[in-house]
């Protein structure tokens, strides 16, 4: 455990922010730097079958130290950080023995406040690692990376019985490409866990069904003084489209198992406009209904337009709720829950209001629920992680390996 914090601070010092709209994978050079560093560290640790694919997926194996019919299991984290907020020149602050109240982030006016983030009340006495208010931290998911690497070191250096352990580090998870080039067969695990969750105890096996909706609107621009009966304002059509989308089904008005429509971006002129929505829902039927709703809205608003003016809508599914795949293998969750209880942690089963690589991998034949990392407030300047939470995550990973070995002996 002594190197856990050291590893984490080293990893977050590297700018691995991914970039959307880029064809190449990984989308940024910084991710390669961390992947090559991890490859070197895995080699120094003595793991075998270490491969780094041309698409930036790093895999390695810790051989079993006991005999028996023990299934190979995996642990997976992603190396990129979110494009939503700067990940360059991350300058972590370490707050030991947190005593409550506001935490100043750097030398400006930014603070991490329990008024805005009440979870801080539960973390008194712990060591918090925060940002300096200028960048994100990168605990999503470098906390997971550091925890997996530390768990490997623990298993390697202690006589803890375990079967074959597979590990993988993926790029571009934050832009939805992390699992697209993942070779499940080459990985060779019967099941796996992503280490990409939040607070201590979180065990997630349900995530959104997700789709993107791109709308292109072509209008007709003429001089406003002679526009009557001729002008078709693409921006007005965009406004009408958004007015038809249920206002009470947006991210800012929903929680728990509630789905939403989210207008992520909009740009344009009188002549042309573009809108980008994302659709999310846990229920597959409701998910399909939301997609139909968007098509109906576009058809309604576009009715009666001049033939040269039109509304074009393209919907693409991004990923699906992994619940239907994971529940087919209940022992995967049973082992994780038992591991947490053995580490004096109360498992907290909650839905992911988002997605993970594990969602896609579960549909590729690798059931893959999500474990906590001990981090909070991802993708922004208020992101932080607790050292105690990270240590708990390492303990759970090690215990999962041990319990899996006992099942097979």
Swiss-Prot record:
Organism: Salmonella gallinarum (strain 287/91 / NCTC 13346)
Cell compartments where the protein resides: Cytoplasm
Molecular-function annotations in GO: metallopeptidase activity; tripeptide aminopeptidase activity; zinc ion binding
InterPro entries documented for this protein: ArgE/DapE_CS, Bact_exopeptidase_dim_dom, Peptidase_M20, Peptidase_M20_dimer, Peptidase_M20B
Signal sequence residues: none
Residues binding Zn(2+) 2, per UniProt: 140, 174, 379
Protein keywords: Aminopeptidase, Cytoplasm, Hydrolase, Metal-binding, Metalloprotease, Protease, Zinc
Active-site residues per Swiss-Prot or TrEMBL entry: 80, 173 (proton acceptor)
Protein purpose: Cleaves the N-terminal amino acid of tripeptides.
Family statement drawn from the similarity comment of this UniProt entry: Belongs to the peptidase M20B family.
Gene coding for it: pepT
Enzyme Commission number(s): 3.4.11.4
Co-factor binding comment: Binds 2 Zn(2+) ions per subunit.
GO cellular component, one term: cytosol
Chief localisation class: cytoplasm
Catalytic activity: Release of the N-terminal residue from a tripeptide
Cofactor(s) recorded in Swiss-Prot or TrEMBL: Zn(2+)
Name this polypeptide is given: Peptidase T
GO biological process: peptide catabolic process; proteolysis
Binding, Zn(2+) 1: 78, 140, 196
Domain of life, per lineage: Bacteria
């Amino acid at each position: 455990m002594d190197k856990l914090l050291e590893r984490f601070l080293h990893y977050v010092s590297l700018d691995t922010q991914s970039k959307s709209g880029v064809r190449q994978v990984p989308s940024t050079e910084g991710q390669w730097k961390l992947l090559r560093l991890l490859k070197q560290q895995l080699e120094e640790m003595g793991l075998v079958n270490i491969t780094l694919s041309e698409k930036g997926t790093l895999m390695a194996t810790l051989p079993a130290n006991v005999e028996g019919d023990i299934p190979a299991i995996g642990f997976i984290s992603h190396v990129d950080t979110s494009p939503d907020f700067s990940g360059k020149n991350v300058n972590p602050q370490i707050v030991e023995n947190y005593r409550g109240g506001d935490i100043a982030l750097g030398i400006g006016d930014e603070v991490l406040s329990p008024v805005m983030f009440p979870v801080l009340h539960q973390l008194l006495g712990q060591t918090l690692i925060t940002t300096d208010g200028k960048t994100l931290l990168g605990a999503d998911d470098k906390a997971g990376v550091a925890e997996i690497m530390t768990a490997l070191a623990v298993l390697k250096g202690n006589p803890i019985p375990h079967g074959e352990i597979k590990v993988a580090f993926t790029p571009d998870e934050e832009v939805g490409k992390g699992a697209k080039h993942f070779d499940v067969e080459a990985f060779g695990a019967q099941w796996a866990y992503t280490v990409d969750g939040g607070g201590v105890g979180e065990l997630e096996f349900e995530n959104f069904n997700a789709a993107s909706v791109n709308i292109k609107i072509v209008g007709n621009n003429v001089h406003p003084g002679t526009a009557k009966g001729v002008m078709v304002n693409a921006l007005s059509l965009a406004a009408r489209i958004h007015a038809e989308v249920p206002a009470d089904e947006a991210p800012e008005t929903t929680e728990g198992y509630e789905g939403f429509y989210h207008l992520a971006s909009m740009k344009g002129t009188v002549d042309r406009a573009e809108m980008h929505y994302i659709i999310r829902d846990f229920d597959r039927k409701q998910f399909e209904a939301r997609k139909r709703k968007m098509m109906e809205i576009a058809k309604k608003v576009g009715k009666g337009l001049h033939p040269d003016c039109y509304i074009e809508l393209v919907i693409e599914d991004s990923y699906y709720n992994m619940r239907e795949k994971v529940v087919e293998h209940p022992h995967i969750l049973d082992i994780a829950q038992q591991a947490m209880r053995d580490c004096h942690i109360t498992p907290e089963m909650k839905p992911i209001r988002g997605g993970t690589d594990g969602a896609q991998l579960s549909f590729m034949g690798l059931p893959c629920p999500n474990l906590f990392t001990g981090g909070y407030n991802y993708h922004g300047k208020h992101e932080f992680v607790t050292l105690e939470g990270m240590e708990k995550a390492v303990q759970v990973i090690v215990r999962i390996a041990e319990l899996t070995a006992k099942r097979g002996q």
